[in-house]
Each structure stands twice: as structure tokens, then as C-alpha cells.
Amino acid sequence: MPPKSRAENRAEQTRAILTRARAQLAEVGPAALSVRQIARDVGLVSSAVYRYFPSRDELLTALIVESYDELGDAVEQADAGVRRRTDLDKRFLAVCVAIRDWARANPHEYALLYGSPVPGYVAPQTTTTSAGRITGAFLRLAQESESEGDALGAPTGTVAPKEHRALGGVRPALETPVSDDRIVRWLMAWTTVFGHVSMELFGHMHRGILDYDAHFRQVTRQLVADLGL
């Protein structure tokens, strides 16, 4: 067998560091992540690991990007798995289930993405592309719903002027026009799904809700009605 190239060795070592870092997330949480300890665990001297990740923050960024990409893969695969593309309700429900399933299978990575901010860490712009894959799935469905003329559920109020202005930051991600009312309704759905998943994962649903699966189905089916799918 020919010797591995430098690039192959680097990729293998980078993978080992990230794998150990994810294990450490489960053990101590992101705030206590120790690059030196990870280096020892994978058989490197502490100074050598900085050739791969110059700082703890860069290692955190790599973990965040990897986790967002894994969640993005799960969401996109779930959407693609619905064969009849005009069944927007089934596609939406598949996306919601994929988010929850991934979160429950990867609770520590989910907490890194959507839990308490890590003290002193500011995520760089490089994380936004991966993070945008999840919101992008919702926005694509919103565009298709607009194109099909789906009637939204009865509104409970009008979109506030400040919200209209804030939507200017969303529009660049849209390939076709979508009304402000519909964008806001889909943003509500997005926050509801992640709010439910976070409440469940972080242990805040133990009173009043006994069947988390049934409750999640009820919540997401109500969202289907609200979105007019």
C-alpha cells in the first residue's frame, strides 16, 4: 500500500480532532472545550494541534459548520424523499420530523447551535452559509406555496412596520416574490418548530405533556393548517 499523502494525513488528523471534540462536547460542554486535552486524546503534543485549528474558537467554528451541514443534509434529504413535489404539506412535515430526529440523535451538537451562547465566542460569517440551509428549506417551501396560491390561515393581526423593514434581510434568499404576510407566517412556523424541539431537548416539557411525539405531530399539523398547505 503506498504511503498516504500529506493532504490525506492532514484530513485524517483533522477528522480525529473533530471526532474527539464532539465527544468532549458531550462530556463538558462547548464553554469548557479544551484544545490541549483534545490534542492529548488524539496522540498529538498540544502545540501540534494548533496547526489544524489555531484557536479554540476556530475549532468551535468547525464544529458549528459541521453540525449545521449535518442538519442541513438531514432536512434536504427529508424534503427530497417526498416523491410528489406538489405535496407541500408532506414535505413540510418531513422537514419538521427531520429537524427533531436529528436534534434528538445529536443533542449536544444541537445545543451548540441553538442553546446558550458560548461565553466570549462570536461566530464568524463563515457559519452563515451552513446555517442558511435550514432556513432555506422553509423559504423554498414558502416560495412554492406562494406560487400555488395557497391561502394562509386567518391572520391574528397585521405585519408591523418594523417587521416589514426587517424582511428586507430575508428577501435576498428568495428566488421568486413572496408576500410579507406569507414570509412572516413561515418564520413563525420556523421558530415554533425549533422552539418545540428546544423545549423538549432542554427538559422544559415534562409538565402537562406526556406524549412528546403526539404533541409534536399536533403542533406541526396545526402549522400546516396555518400555512394553508
Question: What do these predicted ranges mean?
Answer:
Residues E66-G72:
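Short, basic, alpha-helical segments at the C-terminal edge of helix-turn-helix-like DNA-binding modules
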